[in-house]
A protein has these predicted regions:
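Core segments of small alpha/beta cavity-forming domains
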Residues: 43-122
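Surface-exposed, charged secondary-structure patches
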Residues: 112-160
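Hydrophobic/aromatic beta-strand elements that line small-molecule binding cavities or substrate pockets
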Residues: 138, 167-174
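A generic beta-sheet turn/junction motif
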Residues: 144, 174-176
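Short glycine/proline-enriched turns and hinge-like loops at secondary-structure junctions
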Residues: 162-165
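Conserved small/polar residues in nucleotide/adenosyl-binding loops
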Residues: 183-188
Length: 188
């Protein structure tokens, strides 16, 4: 009986700690993110802007989506210049398949991106973190002799003192060369 009581108390304590941590994250000031310093943010931006994606393409479905999420998170930082937003946008487009790229020109994409970033900044919003589903939950399918993989990502977005989530499902398509890595990205 005492053993069961200890387990129940331990579970209750862990649940209270989880709720308290969520409350802490949801109510801390937006300009002080405990998970990231300004130096880390600047080095991340430098890395993302200068990375040679074409020669060093991510090897797995999860890595492609993770790189795209890191680029997206960097867009919405308040101190990112318009020049760096354009560089990040070009980096993100490298991850898009040709079909997705052809839906809008690079200039149209960058214009829409800047408009979206402006809305986020006006709402005092930024992506504080993201979470990609595990590789075990990635769904692989074949359609018209092409291989596809679907994976989900959740962005945690801070607007002022509020924390909300935004889910995105990505479908990646294996390229025609038949290489092991997936080289195309399409967001739903």
């Amino acid at each position: 009986m005492k053993k069961h009581l200890r387990w129940i108390i331990a579970i209750i304590v862990l649940a209270v700690m989880g709720v308290a941590y969520y409350y802490y994250l949801a109510n801390k000031p937006a300009d002080k993110d405990a998970t990231e310093s300004v130096a880390d943010s600047n080095s991340e931006l430098s890395y993302l802007v200068s990375r040679n994606i074409e020669d060093n393409y991510p090897e797995s479905v999860r890595d492609v989506v993770k790189l795209y999420a890191r680029i997206t998170k960097a867009y919405y930082e308040s101190d990112v210049s318009e020049e760096n937003i354009e560089k990040l946008g070009r980096q993100a487009r490298i991850l898009f398949d040709d079909e997705l790229k052809n839906t809008q020109t690079e200039d149209e994409f960058l214009s829409a991106l800047k408009e979206d970033i402006s809305i986020y900044r006006n709402n005092n919003a930024k992506i504080s973190s993201f979470n990609i589903q595990t590789a075990n939950n990635t769904r692989y399918t074949k359609f018209n002799n092409r291989e596809y993989a679907s994976i989900e990502l959740v962005y945690y977005i801070r607007e002022g003192t509020q924390l909300r989530t935004s889910g995105t499902k990505f479908t990646l398509r294996r390229d025609n060369s038949g290489t092991v890595s997936y080289t195309h990205l399409r967001a739903h």
